Each structure stands twice: as structure tokens, then as C-alpha cells.
């Protein structure tokens, strides 16, 4: 009888479930995975090196392009690192706006995750549902920064501008009749805070719809329960963070354990799993969407009652107002210096981490006192999770690899960076 041997299969980088440019070399015994070898680097753009030749403000838009699904959370960590080194005091209103948009970003990320994860496993409807809600939140991004994805809205010392008084409205087109237009524009008649408040009232019903589709669906359970189990000890040893760690039963959330901005004033719960499998991580992320909604509601209520500055008045860090520049020579000089030479960050080093939708996203910044970083190190949460893929997939069927990649919520912008 011929010798039985394993065969090797390339999964990706063109595979639709590979979430970008993942190349997995799978060693199979029949349909059972014996070893999974992830190959990374296909989306490497040298972000850390590029930052060394750019001023601190010029590097900010690179952050959006790391995890291009959780744009403002990346910016948040970068701004916190600079603020830590320079000892900048951020106005309270700016902190509330940041927290609100960080949670909007978390919902955006989890919506794409639940849509794509369900689509990979075979539940197509979920994908369409998720994109319906993402559209509203993308409009918030666009209203506040002018861009739907790469916003570059956060700034060292605050945010780029205050929240607008109006929302963009849909106009007449061939595919939308008057009745449809009236429905779409119903919540857009007031300010941006009105629109966000309207969304937060509608959103829990939408999450209930997702749970109706998936939570007790027996096919969904068959594809996720007991798949990719990670024990609490292994989750810690493998460097997992975020929903991957909380899904294994460890209540570690930087927003609670090491609060930044105004998270210490927020009332929310940290969902924790029990079994550490794909199903538990799904439940954790769904509950996170509900908790993010709660935080956004608290931010909206505070922002309504407390007007004020949204960026520091230190013009060595933040540009002066347009009006000031037109009438005051000193403001004009500050503006010119800031956007040509940039700000000089004191010599030293700092690490700032945020509770990113995927885990702990950290920025380690080293400065030699110049106007550019001496070294910028990015701690991407997905990097540690992908390293655990071999351990999570071994012994499972090849079809379950897709579910495990989905549950890790991998985006290659941050892994290859």
C-alpha cells in the first residue's frame, strides 16, 4: 500500500475569506488541518519608517490607513502618545467628542466584522443588514471630517473642528422616489448630535435583528460552538487582547483598567465569554455594540449641555483660528511654523494604548527633540492573534479555518503596516 502523506494547500491571498492578503499554507490530512502557516507582508508599506521622515502632524493620516476599518481609534493612540510626551491638556469637550467617535468606530468595525464573518460561514443576509447601519455612521464621519473613511479628525491636543450644526441630506435621483427620500432624510433635519441621538435610539432594535438571525440559528451554532477554543491561560500567553481575550473569560478592557480621556466618567459594562470559542467571541462583540451605543448616548447628552473649545489653545501644537490669522500677525506666524516645520516634541519616549475594536492598539514613540519621531513602533492587536492561528486551527476541518480567521477579525493594514 502506498505511503499515506499529508498534502499542502495554499489558502489565499486571492481567497474571498482571506480578509485582504492573508496567505495560509495549510498542511492537511484529508480535510483535517495538521498545521497552518500564515505568510504575512503582502501589504507592507513601511509606515513606521515613513513616519521618521515626516513631521508629527504629517504622520497622522498614516494612522487611518493601518487598520482601515477602525480609523479614528488608530489616530486616538497616536495623539495620546504625543500628548503624553508634551504634557498637553486636552479640553474636556474634545475628550468627549473623541470618546464618542471612538465608540462610533467600534460599532463600524463590529458591523463589518459580523457581516463578513457571517458571509464567510454562509449567512448572506447579515452582510446587507450590517451595511445599512454602517452607511449612517459613515455619514457622521463625512459630516465631521469630509471623508468617509480616512478622516484624520483627531489632532494632538483635541480634534480638528467642532461638531457641525447640520447633516448632509439625500437629494433626488433616479433610484430614490420622494417617499424613500423623506424616510432617509427624516433624521437629518437637525444637528449632527440630533442625528447621532436618533441613531442610538434605533440601533438596539437593529442589534436584536442580528441576534434573531444568528444567535439561536442552529447552523450558526454548529459552525461556531467549540471551534477555535482558547483557554484563558493560553489567551494570556499568546498575547491576545480585546474580544479574543474577553471571549476566553478574562475581563481585561483598557477603558476600565487604564482609562484614558473621559472613559472613567462613562457607565458601561465589559462583556466576558465563558467557553473561549468562536460563538463566545461572537456574543462578546454583539454585546460590545450595545455597550458602545450606551457610551455614545452619554456623550451626546454631555456635549449638548457643555459647549466649549475642542482643541488646546497652545499654538505650538494646534493651529490658530482662521479669523485670528487674518487679523493677527503672530497667529499667522504660528500657523506657518506649525505646517512647515512642525512641532518639536521633547526628548524622551512614551507608550500610549487604546482599547481598539480588535484589542490593545499601542503606539510607542521615541523622540530626540526634533520635529520628527526618532522611532515609531506600532503594536497591532491582530499581529498576536494571527500568530495563534496555527494553534487554533490544528485539528479542525478546512471549512472551520474560515470561521477561525473570521473570529480573529483580522485586517492586514495593521499587521503588515
Swiss-Prot record:
Pfam families: Complex1_49kDa (PF00346)
Entry keyword annotation includes Calcium: no
Record's keyword annotation contains Cell membrane: yes
Domain of life, source organism: Bacteria
EC number(s) from the headed UniProt entry: 7.1.1.-
Membrane topology: Peripheral membrane protein
Record-linked HAMAP family: NDH1_NuoD
Quaternary structure and partners: NDH-1 is composed of 14 different subunits. Subunits NuoB, C, D, E, F, and G constitute the peripheral sector of the complex.
Name the UniProt record assigns to this protein: NADH-quinone oxidoreductase subunit D
Lineage per the UniProt record: Bacteria, Pseudomonadati, Pseudomonadota, Betaproteobacteria, Neisseriales
Gene field: nuoD
Amino acid at each position: 500500500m502506498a505511503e499515506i502523506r499529508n498534502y499542502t494547500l495554499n489558502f489565499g491571498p486571492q481567497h474571498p475569506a482571506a480578509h485582504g492578503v492573508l496567505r495560509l499554507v495549510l498542511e492537511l490530512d484529508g480535510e483535517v488541518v495538521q498545521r497552518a502557516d500564515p505568510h504575512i507582508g503582502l501589504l507592507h508599506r513601511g509606515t513606521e519608517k515613513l513616519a521618521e521622515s515626516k513631521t508629527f502632524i504629517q504622520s497622522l493620516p498614516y494612522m487611518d490607513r493601518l487598520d482601515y476599518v477602525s480609523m479614528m481609534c488608530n489616530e486616538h493612540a497616536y495623539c495620546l502618545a504625543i500628548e503624553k510626551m508634551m504634557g498637553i491638556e486636552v479640553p474636556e469637550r474634545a475628550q468627549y467628542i473623541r470618546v464618542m467617535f471612538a465608540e462610533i468606530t467600534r460599532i463600524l468595525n463590529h458591523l463589518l466584522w459580523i457581516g463578513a464573518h457571517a458571509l464567510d460561514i454562509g449567512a448572506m443576509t447579515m452582510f446587507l443588514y450590517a451595511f445599512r447601519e454602517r452607511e449612517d455612521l459613515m455619514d457622521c464621519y463625512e459630516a465631521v471630517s469630509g471623508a468617509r473613511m480616512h478622516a484624520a479628525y483627531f489632532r494632538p491636543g483635541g480634534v480638528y473642528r467642532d461638531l457641525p450644526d447640520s447633516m448632509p441630506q439625500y437629494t433626488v435621483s433616479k433610484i430614490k422616489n420622494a417617499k424613500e427620500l423623506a424616510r432617509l432624510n427624516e433624521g437629518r433635519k437637525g444637528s449632527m448630535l440630533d442625528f447621532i441621538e436618533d441613531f442610538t435610539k434605533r440601533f438596539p432594535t437593529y442589534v436584536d435583528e442580528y441576534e434573531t438571525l444568528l444567535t439561536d440559528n442552529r447552523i450558526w451554532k454548529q459552525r461556531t460552538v467549540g471551534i477555535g477554543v482558547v483557554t484563558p491561560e493560553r489567551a494570556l500567553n499568546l498575547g491576545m487582547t480585546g474580544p479574543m481575550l474577553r471571549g476566553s473569560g478574562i475581563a481585561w478592557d483598557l477603558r476600565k483598567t487604564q482609562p484614558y480621556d473621559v472613559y472613567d466618567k462613562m457607565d458601561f459594562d465589559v462583556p466576558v465569554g465563558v467557553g473561549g470559542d468562536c460563538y463566545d467571541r461572537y456574543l462578546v462583540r454583539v454585546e460590545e455594540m450595545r455597550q458602545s451605543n450606551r457610551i455614545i448616548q452619554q456623550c451626546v447628552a454631555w456635549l449638548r449641555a457643555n459647549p466649549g473649545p475642542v482643541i488646546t489653545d497652545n499654538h505650538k501644537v494646534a493651529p490658530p483660528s482662521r479669523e485670528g490669522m487674518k487679523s493677527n500677525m503672530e497667529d499667522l506666524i504660528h500657523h506657518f511654523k506649525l505646517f512647515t516645520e512642525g512641532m518639536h516634541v521633547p526628548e524622551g519616549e512614551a507608550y500610549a494604548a487604546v482599547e481598539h475594536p480588535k484589542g490593545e492598539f499601542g503606539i510607542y514613540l521615541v523622540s530626540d527633540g526634533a520635529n520628527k519621531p526618532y522611532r515609531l513602533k506600532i503594536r497591532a492587536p491582530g499581529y498576536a492573534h494571527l500568530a495563534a492561528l496555527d494553534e487554533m486551527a490544528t485539528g479542525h476541518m478546512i471549512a472551520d479555518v474560515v470561521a477561525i480567521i473570521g473570529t480573529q477579525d483580522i485586517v492586514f493594514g495593521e499587521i503588515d503596516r
